[in-house]
């Protein structure tokens, strides 16, 4: 399935990323999170939740990242989702979903397959976010691959 979504315009105030393996076989094969949610706020506060295959929260973490990393994440995400793209989704694979809220309160939502290359200026957004928040097994867009 492919869809064309609106291009992000504005200044990001909040990012929420949900990485969901609940429809994919690999969430059942390992003792891992079936779904993860990370929220990065403009004040650099971060909320992380990991859920099991039963949908119950297995773990959570609240932290604050440095303002420089938060700014870079917001810039990279705005740059990536600020370009027109065709999005494809396989319903039997893991999917990611991102919700961006701009400074005027407008919400933008995008989704894709886990494993997609989501890069800005040659830098993997998944790797940069993992390093910035200090959660090494964060799925984000690439599924921690």
Segment roles from a protein language model:
Residues 35-39, 97:
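Short, surface-exposed charged micro-motifs
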Residues 43-53:
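N-terminal glycine/threonine-rich, aromatic-flanked beta-hairpin/loop signature
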Residues 39-45, 101-105:
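Short acidic-glycine loop/turn motifs at beta-strand connectors
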Residues 1-30, 55-63, 68-145:
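Short, well-ordered, aromatic-rich surface patches in folded extracellular/luminal domains
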